[in-house]
């Protein structure tokens, strides 16, 4: 017994110009640029959330009328790796990967989802992730508005509404 469904609620940094501070990002997959998930599955195994949980998060964000984006997020170990990468010994690698992820449409950068998605696959449980965008350094580079937003209330509300939806749909399946 125990929990069978998990939702990670947190913060991220935007990577695409259309992803604004205060928006919600719902992950549909995570780039495994961290170390934890490699201890559970080969790097070729994708880090993806449960579709039912992800759809519940999308439905909740739509119901609340919050601005949101769905897509791939970058999951990394270093909180400040993307800030002034040229000052770091592996700056060339950080810069090249950051640019590649942007070109591939990666929406945001965060630190937990890949490990959670792979771990959930191993444990045969459901997981999803939603984030509040704190800021977006790419918008700043383009001279676009980029206020820093720390109020995670919208992301929490999306997760709570998603849990309500999952409880309802799971209950109907048992009937």
Located regions from the model:
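Glycine-rich phosphate- or other oxyanion-binding loops that anchor nucleotides, phosphorylated ligands
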Residues: 1-175
